[in-house]
From Swiss-Prot:
Boundaries of every F-box domain copy: 2-47
Signal peptide span: none
Pfam entry (one): FBA_1
Domain of life of the source: Eukaryota
Organism: Arabidopsis thaliana (Mouse-ear cress)
Cysteines paired by S-S bonds: none
Listed name of the protein: Putative F-box protein At5g41510
Gene3D superfamilies with a match to the protein in the record: 1.20.1280.50
Length: 400
């Protein structure tokens, strides 16, 4: 007697359906109510999204809402780009509220509404690691710390590390204050970094992590100029590198960075077309080579955006298809639009996207390990003194 597929065990049905292409899932959902419910379950989503991301040509976009992760795929074809909501992952409990999220190789660094701790989350594996912060600084409810996630290369493995810093470089010299510290996932210890910054990184500039290191748009600390450089933090050496020049020789009122397949950096520039106008054009450049002390660039795309698109909050590119994807609010601050632009101009505008802070996403098998009890260590007395000195300096400068 033949067995009907609906009578098979749930885990076997999930395994079968996980091999169905994303573009064919609509037919599966319409077959019956139970299959529709199964296709939206968290256990099925983990398996299906993981396989689909490597099987199909698409860009996966995620957005962390207060306590959950939404997933959307964008497919760029030769006819019409398409977007589809793919599912959700939940972060433990609804009481955990997320303010900000940074993405790195399938891991999410979540800055919580609770100012005393953060969480590193692999939604694909369902693993989390909570980190207790030594101090928080949120005057008027605004978090002035900046954050980055990366890893240090060791002989046999890679070790996750977490950087955060506070830097009031735009103050008068006598009022300047900076504090850079790093957290080691293996030891569970904080270390105050001995740095004298020659750079300035604005708090509104998001970072990009690539091959274990993190990059920011930056400026020379001693000047009032634009962000004409990028700067890298090396998690293995635990130090910043030199300022590396950006490729444009035009004054840019805005610079943003993105990753290209976890292999290259992309830089987006916003240029004013005329000194007396508010019309702009965008340029995108991609790195052809990037090392500790040098970087080379190649122009990818130029876009005259008047009047179709505002300043992109986040952007991604498909290098092979010569396509740009950027999110902006347009004239409606409560709505979000996704603009898809190619060499020939606008391809499509997706309206009313229900995303707050979207970023690209590829499911990852990177382990977020818990700190073993037998490896618990106490902070050294020297580090405790450095921490106390920074707290005192911060209070004296009137910024606590």
């Amino acid at each position: 007697m033949a067995t009907m597929i609906s009578n098979l065990p749930r885990d076997l049905i999930e395994e079968i359906f996980s091999r169905v292409p994303l573009t064919s899932m609509k037919a599966v959902r319409l077959t019956c109510k139970s299959w529709n419910n199964l296709s939206k379950s968290e256990s099925f989503t983990k398996v299906h999204i993981g396989r689909a991301a490597t099987r199909e040509e698409k860009t996966m976009i995620v957005d962390v809402m207060p306590h959950k992760l939404n997933l959307m795929s964008i497919v760029i074809d030769d006819v019409t780009p398409s977007a589809e909501f793919k599912g959700q992952f939940s972060l433990l409990h609804k009481n955990y509220r997320i303010n900000q999220v940074l993405h790195y190789e399938g891991l999410l660094l979540c800055i919580m509404k609770d100012p005393t701790r953060i969480v590193v989350w692999n939604p694909y594996l369902g693993q989390t690691r909570w980190i207790q912060l030594r101090y928080f600084h949120r005057p008027h409810g605004i978090d002035h710390f900046r954050y980055a996630l990366g890893y240090a290369d060791k002989e046999s493995c890679s070790s996750l590390k977490f950087l955060r810093f506070l830097d009031y470089f735009y103050k008068a010299p006598e009022e300047e204050f900076f504090w850079y510290e790093i957290y080691d996932f293996d030891s569970g210890l904080w270390t105050t970094l001995n740095v004298t910054p020659h750079w300035g990184i604005y708090s509104t500039c998001p970072c990009v992590s690539l091959k274990g290191n993190t990059y920011w748009p930056a400026k020379e600390r001693s000047t009032q100029g634009f962000q004409d450089y990028i700067i890298r933090f090396d998690f293995t050496r635990e130090r910043f590198g030199p300022l590396l020049a950006l490729p444009t020789d035009r004054e840019s009122s805005f610079v943003s960075l993105s990753c290209v397949k976890e292999e290259k950096l992309a830089a987006l520039f916003k240029h004013r077309l005329h000194h007396d106008s508010y019309e702009y054009e965008f340029e995108i450049w991609i790195t052809t080579k990037i090392e500790v002390e040098m970087v080379s660039w190649s122009k990818f795309l130029r876009m005259d955006m008047r009047p179709k698109m505002e300043l992109p909050l986040t952007f991604y590119i498909d290098e092979e298809k010569k396509v740009f994807m950027g999110f902006d609010h347009g004239e409606y601050p409560k709505l979000l639009f996704l603009n898809v632009v190619g060499e020939t101009g606008f391809l499509r505008k997706f309206e009313n996207i229900q995303y707050r802070s979207p970023c690209s996403y590829v499911p990852s098998l990177v382990q977020v390990k818990k700190l073993a009890r037998d490896r618990l260590r106490k902070q050294r007395s020297l580090e405790n003194r450095r921490f106390a000195q920074n707290i005192l300096r911060l209070a004296r400068n009137g910024k606590s």
